[in-house]
């Protein structure tokens, strides 16, 4: 009599275990500023780009990273000179990519100024709480 368990679909736990072992297929794009962007292969098929530091980059860059087998050793294939395809958009205002930071203040860092300063509370108050 044939074994009926051979026709069963693997359990969901087994399917998840197999999916976790599968390598994520992604493409690496090295930018001129030194940053590296990884784009999932399925996302890159749409041809959408992205903006980084005020510059628009095409998602169809020429440098790919493939992971081979279990060793995960990188193999680079550069079809053209490296880097990403850059498009200058005249419609997008290109301001300084460095955002100004708020100046540091010497005032209290409490967000609600009506609350009393914690430094002014007597130490016996804290002793009663933590006993």
Swiss-Prot record:
Zinc finger (unnamed): 33-52
Pfam assignment, any one: Gemini_AL2
Domain notes: The zinc finger and the transactivation region are involved in PTGS suppression.
Function statement: Strong activator of the late viral genes promoters. Enhances the expression of the capsid protein and nuclear shuttle protein. Acts as a suppressor of RNA-mediated gene silencing, also known as post-transcriptional gene silencing (PTGS), a mechanism of plant viral defense that limits the accumulation of viral RNAs. Suppresses the host RNA silencing by inhibiting adenosine kinase 2 (ADK2), a kinase involved in a general methylation pathway.
Transmembrane segments: none
Binding partners and assembly: Monomer. Homodimer. Homooligomer. Self-interaction correlates with nuclear localization and efficient activation of transcription. Monomers suppress local silencing by interacting with and inactivating host adenosine kinase 2 (ADK2) in the cytoplasm. Interacts with and inhibits host SNF1 kinase. Binds to ssDNA.
InterPro entries: Gemini_AL2
Family of the protein in this entry: Belongs to the geminiviridae transcriptional activator protein family.
Source species: Squash leaf curl virus
Localization, UniProt: Host nucleus; Host cytoplasm
Coiled coil start-end: none
Annotated spans, Transactivation: 117-131
Biological-process GO terms, alphabetical: symbiont-mediated suppression of host innate immune response
Name used for this protein in its record: Transcriptional activator protein
Region entry Disordered, spans: 78-131
Posttranslational modification: Phosphorylated.
Example GO molecular function: DNA binding
Origin superkingdom: Viruses
Motif placement: Nuclear localization signal: 13-28
Gene Ontology CC: one annotated term: host cell cytoplasm
Keyword terms of this UniProt record: Activator, DNA-binding, Host cytoplasm, Host nucleus, Host-virus interaction, Inhibition of host innate immune response by virus, Metal-binding, Phosphoprotein, Suppressor of RNA silencing, Viral immunoevasion, Zinc, Zinc-finger
